[in-house]
Amino acid sequence: MLSQKPKKKHNFLNHGLSLNLVIKPYLALEGSVAFPAENGVQDTESTQEKRETGDEENSAKFPVGRRDFDTLSCMLGRVYQSCWQV
């Protein structure tokens, strides 16, 4: 009879692959991204100014129906039914 070796869990780290990758954690962001609360107030105010200064006559208006909202909420994953049922 052949002797059977105990089965090891398949793990790519055990196969000689060296991982010399330096991966920063999600919270180790640099610059203005690290503290959006400080810059967020200025961005919000400038966005609001741009919205108020737009011409109402030249702005495009599209009819939005219930089906559009259902499809959007389905894409965002905030409904309990499947996307194909929309």
Curated annotation (Swiss-Prot):
Cellular component terms per the entry's GO annotation: extracellular region; synapse
Name of the molecule in the record: Putative pro-MCH-like protein 1
Region (Disordered): 38-62
Annotated segments matching region NEI-like: 52-64
Organism: Homo sapiens (Human)
Region span, Melanin-concentrating hormone-like: 68-86
Tissue spec. comment: Expressed in testis and brain.
Region entry NGE-like, spans: 31-49
Upper lineage: Eukaryota, Metazoa, Chordata, Craniata, Vertebrata
GO annotation (BP), single: chemical synaptic transmission
Pfam families: Pro-MCH
Disulfide bonds listed in the record: none
GO function terms (MF aspect): melanin-concentrating hormone activity; type 1 melanin-concentrating hormone receptor binding
Assigned protein family: Belongs to the melanin-concentrating hormone family.
InterPro entries: Prepro-melanin_conc_hormone (IPR005456)
